Amino acid sequence: MAIDVVALRSRFPSLAHGFAFFDGPGGTQTPAPVAEAIARTMTGPLSNRGTVSVSERNAERTVAEFRAAYADLLGVPASGVVHGRSATQLTYDFSRHLAKTWRAGDEIVLSRLDHDANVRPWIQAAQRAGVAVRWIEIDPATAGLDLDSYERALSPRTRLVAVTAASNVLGSLPPVRLIADRAHEVGALVHVDGVHYAAHRLVDVPALGADLFVCSPYKFLGPHCGVLAGSPDLLGTLAPDKLVPSADTVPERFEFGTLPYEVLAGATAAVDFLAAMDPDGEEGHDGADAAGPAGLRESAGQGVPGVSRRERLRRSLRSLHAHETALRARTEDGLRALGDAVTVHSKAPERTPTLLMTLEGRDAREAQAHLAARGVVAPAGSFYAHEVFAALKLPDPSLRVGLAPYNDAEDVDRLLDGLSSFLRTAV
C-alpha cells in the first residue's frame, strides 16, 4: 500500500502556509503530534528525575521512553542510546573520549564524502594525539567512495574509521558494512554518521557494522537534538570527563547536566509518528486511538496489537522509500527536460532522494531567491560538505533539492516550473 500523502500532509501545520519545502536534508517540518508532545511535557508536572513525586516520575518515564524509542528505531539496546544537543556535539564528545586511547604513530581513516561534522572533530583529535589521518577518496565517475583508496588507507595501525552512511549533498550510499568489516579486520572501531541516512532508511546499527552511530531527529520530523547509539559494552570502556556527583552508569555518564525532557518527548513522538505512517499497520486496528483523518496515532507506545514498533517502522520506511523514490524519478525526469542548463551531480546507483545541482552560467543563490518568491524552498550552499566540494570541484553555492515524507507531486511540479522560469529569465 502507498502512503496516504494527503492525510499525512494534514498533520503538518506549516504546510498550511502554502510552501513547497525541499530543504529536508537541513531539517524537516514538524508534525503536530511532535509539537504537542513537547508542549505536554513542558506544561505538565515535571521535575528532575527521581521516583518520589509524580513530577520526578514523569521525567524518569520521559527518558526511558526516549531510549526505548531510539532502541527500536536504530536496532540497539536502550542502554546504548545517548542523547546530545546535536550530532556534531556528540561526535566532538566521542572524538575526545576515543582519542584518550590513541598513541603517536596510530592512524585514523576519514572519508571525503562526509559532512564536516564527521571530519573536523576527528582531524582535531588526531592532531592533539599525534595521530596520522588517511583518506577514502571520492570516485568522480560515480559520486561514491573509491574503495581502492580505502584499501590503501587501512593498515594495522588504524584505530578508527569514520564514514557516512549517506552523503548529505549527493545522497550517495556507500557500502558501510563492507567498510566496517575491513576496519574490524585490522582492529579499528567504526563511527558512522547516519544523520542523512536515518531520514530515508530503516537503521540497523549492528547490521551496518557500526560501533558508534549518530543521527539527528530533526532530520526526520523531530526536534533539534542528536542521538548516538553504541554497544553498551563499548560505551562502558570509555571514560568521559564528568562531574563527580553525576551518574557514572552507561549511557548517563555521557549526558551532561539536566536533560531537556521536552525535547526527548518530542523525539520519541517523532519515532511514533514514523511508525504510524505504515498503511498496512492499520489492519486489524480498531481506530480507537486514531488521531485525525490520517489515522496517525499521537501517543507513545500505541499501535497495532501484536505488531512491534520496530516492525511498524520497517513497514513505514519501506512505504516511505517507495514514495520518495517515485518523487525522485519525477524530479529527475523534469530536470532532464530542462536540458543542458542543469547539471545534477547526484549519480550514485544507490542514493537517497537528494539532488545537488548547478545551473549553467547562473548563481544558485539567485535560483534560490527566485524559487522562494514562488513559495518553493530549495537552499543554495555547500551544506558543510567541505571535502565533497573540494574533491569534486563543485561550485559553491550549488542548489540542493531534498525530498521528505510530506512532499507530493504538486511540490515537484512547482519546483520544476520555478526552475524553468528562472532559466528563461535574462542573465
Give residue spans per PLM region.
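Pyridoxal 5′-phosphate
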Residues: M1-V427
